[in-house]
Amino acid sequence: MSCRVMGIVNVTPDSFSDGGQFFKPEEAIRRAKNLIADGADIIDLGGESTRPGATPIGWEEEWNRIGPVLEKVADLGVLVSVDTYHPETAERAIKAGAHIINCVYAEPIPEMLKLLKGNEVELVFPVSALPLIPNPQSLIPRLYLDPMIGFNTTREEDVELLRSIPELAKKGRVLVGASRKRIVKKMTGEKSSVGKNIGGNVAIAVWAAMQGASVVRVHDVKETVQALRVLRALREE
């Protein structure tokens, strides 16, 4: 089992779980350093909240938020991902040292694919956008399929998506991002505040890894890394 951990840094004032905590560049850079120390293999920088009801922003504002952070994090010796659906932001991020573009919407995928030409960058995209990719087999080594847990989905749909990971993994690398989304509360019936469902979040990450996910995108890096290390040790003994 080989599953990397992607740590989330939201450089936003309004993300659903930690909006505003890391909005200043120095705070976001410190957050990234802490996640790396906790064992993150990849840092995912986001400048726009994708929570339901969030106010969209233009690519210029998004880039003004993440650009100064990306330049510093790219020098920390870790893979850097940029969470954006704006091709303009993605293009600038690649030039600034990003290794992965994480796009949660299908519509921009054709433009994002153009950015792969002449660059070694990789692309995360919704599995629903697979039909938009011409000759996907030639690009598979540079793509990650995202089942899109928690994006306008019911509890039953989220569970089915998680159970579909083995089949998705036959098509290519799978990235699962279910951290701090409502699925844990939906599955347990708990009404605790955001960030208090660490056990459930880690359980989903471990499940995803066991089912064949190549990357889990999480807020609670330290706990997830520890759980995956224990799982690997148990499998090896």
Locate each region found by the language model.
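Generic enzyme active-site microenvironment
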Residues: 8, 42, 81, 144, ...
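Catalytic domains of carbohydrate-active enzymes, especially glycoside hydrolases
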Residues: 30-46, 211
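Active-site-adjacent loop and "lid" segments of alpha/beta metabolic enzymes
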Residues: 17-26, 30, 50-71, 79, ...
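Residue-level signal for inorganic ion chemistry
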Residues: 39, 101, 145
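Short helix-capping segments at alpha-helix termini
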Residues: 73-78, 138-141
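Short beta-strands and strand-loop turn motifs
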Residues: 12, 43-47, 124-127, 144-149
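N-terminal amphipathic alpha-helix/helix-capping segment at the start of soluble metabolic enzymes
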Residues: 1-16, 30, 237
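Short, basic, low-complexity termini and linkers enriched in Ser/Thr/Gly/Pro
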Residues: 1-2, 131-141, 237
